[in-house]
């Protein structure tokens, strides 16, 4: 069955209802989570028909052949069944879908790239605003500005801007959506030089829960602009983002992979290397399983003169990596090389922030990785350079203190493996907690009020007040949620 447009939907819904002898209600209620449950009105054929008649995009229900593909998200640990998915064609579709979900008292999810660690882009038994068809990117080379629709992926933004030798901080995985990335802060290979993705956001078009289409910028709704630069999708549905671009052409990029057995020495060398590295140097370390034992891999991307970049890498190459793939390439090539998870898979990931990689912290990390299941890893992301020179209260994104983000993750394909992975990830986080002081909300595979507060630190109280203004009923709650009725103390 084809996707449902407003023209085709009237007869399709009537036929389906007659055939199955039942209303087209929230069939996705199978497996509804406690967080998603609401006493919503059933979605019968007439309700869906009326919705489709006002939508320029496509309306997808459990009866359409595209339903399973449309509800599929990157983290296959979540298998959610929404009652209806609205693949929006523009802001007006977003506004109409927001109104529909609230009128029917149904849970509402917003999907752009579909990479949420907690599967927030889908919900059980509710309504999904799907932005994936809105992915146009326009580049103004004179102003060095990109204007991108919220369904664009990192690869869409990079491909459009690299045609002109330009780029902005946009994450390290090509299939991540730029909207979720940016709204949560946005780490990437250029953050040491040019700041986080949210630091390069010039303005955004937002549909508020009451259906208004507004601009968020330093001059228009500045409180909203402050909040969406790190505060996630708590305040409205962003439909367009405008970014500052920078000249980025050739980079020195690749990885140094070392033999097993030298993780503590290599991490100490990594810390020393970073201390003398300029802002042009992005580097992160991965602690990986292998048949020979745990090993360390250092990924680098240097956006300055490649000859100088090679000179800077001499201390790391002195440890004789068994594989050295670092070479000069286009920034686009570096960006499309892949990320931690190259393909959709069931996974669990969490993180914490460390102010330093002390000897004790390195020992704890080494012990953890030596005990890790074969499908688990840890990633050490330095927080330094331009991203750490922004005042913590200038944006909602609070990761401004120099230090390290430790991402702890694992994948599985059986229930037994899942239990082992989750147990190790949680135990590793707990063991590193004495060295930690916060979290990055975009990389959390679990959620709680305490974790959300920890992610926003001194900005939490202001975020609560802005949430009360723009979404007092917490319609947009399937996210790392800032509750409007939260006590504002941190």
Predicted segments — roles?
Residues 2-490:
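Soluble FAD-dependent oxygen oxidases
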């Amino acid at each position: 069955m084809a996707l449902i447009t407003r023209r085709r939907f009237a007869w399709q819904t009537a036929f389906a209802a007659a055939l199955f002898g039942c209303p087209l209600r929230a069939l996705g209620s199978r497996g509804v989570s406690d967080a998603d449950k609401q006493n919503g009105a059933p979605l019968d054929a007439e309700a869906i028909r009326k919705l489709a008649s006002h939508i320029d995009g496509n309306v997808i229900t459990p009866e359409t052949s595209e339903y399973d593909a449309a509800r599929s998200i990157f983290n296959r640990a979540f298998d959610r069944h929404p009652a209806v998915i609205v693949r929006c064609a523009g802001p007006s579709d977003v506004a109409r879908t927001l109104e529909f979900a609230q009128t029917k008292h149904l849970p509402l999810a917003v999907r752009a790239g579909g990479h949420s660690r907690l599967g927030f882009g889908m919900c059980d038994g509710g309504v999904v605003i799907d932005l994936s068809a809105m992915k146009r990117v326009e580049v103004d080379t004179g102003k060095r500005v990109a204007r991108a629709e919220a369904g664009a992926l990192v690869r869409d933004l990079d491909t459009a801007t690299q045609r002109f030798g330009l780029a902005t901080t946009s994450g390290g995985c090509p299939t991540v959506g730029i909207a979720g990335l940016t709204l949560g802060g946005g780490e990437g290979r250029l953050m040491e030089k040019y700041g986080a993705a949210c630091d390069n956001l010039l303005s955004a078009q937002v549909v508020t829960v009451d259906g208004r289409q507004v601009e968020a910028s330093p001059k228009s709704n500045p409180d909203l602009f402050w909040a969406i630069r790190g505060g996630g999708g708590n305040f409205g549905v962003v439909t367009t983002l405008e970014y500052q671009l920078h000249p980025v052409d050739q980079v020195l990029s690749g990885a140094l992979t070392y033999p097993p057995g030298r993780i503590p020495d290599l991490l100490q060398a990594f810390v020393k290397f970073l201390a003398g590295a300029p802002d042009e140097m992005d580097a992160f370390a991965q602690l990986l399983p292998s048949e020979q034992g745990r090993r360390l891999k250092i990924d680098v991307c240097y956006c300055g003169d490649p000859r100088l970049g090679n000179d800077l890498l001499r201390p790391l190459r002195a440890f004789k990596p068994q594989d050295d793939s670092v070479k000069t390439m286009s920034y686009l090539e570096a960006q499309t090389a892949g990320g931690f998870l190259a393909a959709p898979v069931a996974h669990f990931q969490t993180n914490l922030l460390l102010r330093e990689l002390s000897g004790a912290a390195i020992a704890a990390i080494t012990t953890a990785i030596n005990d890790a299941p074969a499908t688990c890893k840890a990633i050490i992301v330095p927080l330094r350079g331009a991203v750490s020179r922004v005042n913590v209260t200038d944006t909602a994104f609070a990761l401004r203190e120099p230090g390290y983000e430790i991402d702890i993750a694992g994948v599985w394909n059986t229930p037994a493996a899942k239990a082992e992975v989750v147990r190790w990830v949680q135990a590793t986080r707990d063991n590193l907690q004495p060295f930690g002081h916060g979290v990055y909300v975009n990389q959390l595979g679990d959620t709680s009020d305490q974790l959300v507060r920890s992610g926003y630190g001194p900005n939490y109280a202001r975020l609560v007040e802005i949430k009360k203004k723009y979404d007092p009923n917490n319609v947009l709650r399937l996210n790392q949620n800032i509750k409007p009725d939260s006590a504002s103390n941190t």
